[in-house]
């Protein structure tokens, strides 16, 4: 069935409890590549509890995951994550319980050929005192659901890559088993466990992407400072 604008805009949950342990945060860090060099204290702090375990800021994307749009009527096989962002109010603790408010924030009809854009906002606060922890936003592109008659909305500006050199470049090699390590962070699915044969005849794990992190060989992260 086609998606319904009024129904989508009414979707929200309040105070959903999300509990996580230090085992969860540690496993996430291993899954995205930390711990390749156990002698590096900067890596060890994210994968060993005796080192004063820290939580990666990007773990917020996992804590914000939910089933809010599971039955919204879109053609799920043609849905892709368009963009996401996280704003931290304070560091995420290594273990704890959060109360998360989620809602569909935006819905725009880009036309039958372009699809629909659906934005979800998740705001998390600590259960014990209500202090804000983070706000996560995701925009989904439902490629098969455009032309449903909803408002087009204002088109967001494209992200333009800077032409100058990055402030910092840190290339790192992804372990061959990293996709397998990352799977249990989200769910045990076949994705990320299938093997593919590369052009040179070598067999390797298929690239796996979830929770805002792409796991693939020879990845390089570039961060702009300031």
Write out the residue ranges for each language-model feature.
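Hot-dog-fold acyl-thioester-processing enzymes
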Residues: 1-81, 150-153, 160-226
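HotDog/MaoC-like acyl-thioester-processing domains
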Residues: 1-14, 79-170
């Amino acid at each position: 069935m086609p998606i319904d604008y009024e129904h989508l805009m009414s979707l929200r949950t309040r105070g959903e409890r999300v509990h996580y342990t230090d085992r969860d945060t540690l496993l996430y860090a291993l899954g995205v590549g930390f711990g390749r060099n156990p002698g590096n204290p900067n890596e060890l702090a994210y994968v060993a509890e005796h080192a004063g375990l820290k939580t990666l800021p990007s773990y917020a994307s996992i804590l914000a995951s939910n089933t809010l749009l599971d039955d919204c009527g879109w053609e799920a096989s043609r849905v892709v994550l368009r963009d996401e962002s996280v704003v931290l109010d304070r560091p995420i603790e290594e273990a704890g319980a959060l109360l998360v408010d989620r809602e569909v924030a935006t819905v725009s009809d880009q036309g039958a050929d372009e699809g629909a854009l659906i934005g979800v906002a998740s705001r998390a606060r600590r259960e014990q005192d209500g202090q804000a922890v983070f706000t996560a936003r995701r925009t989904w592109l439902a490629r098969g659901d455009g032309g449903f008659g909803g408002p087009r909305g204002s088109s967001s500006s494209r992200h333009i890559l800077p032409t100058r050199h990055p402030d910092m470049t840190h290339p790192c090699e992804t372990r061959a088993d990293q996709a397998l390590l990352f799977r249990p962070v989200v769910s045990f699915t076949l994705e990320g466990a299938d093997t593919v044969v590369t052009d040179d005849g070598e067999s390797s794990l298929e690239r796996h992407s979830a929770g805002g992190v792409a796991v693939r060989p020879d990845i390089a992260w570039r961060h702009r400072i300031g």
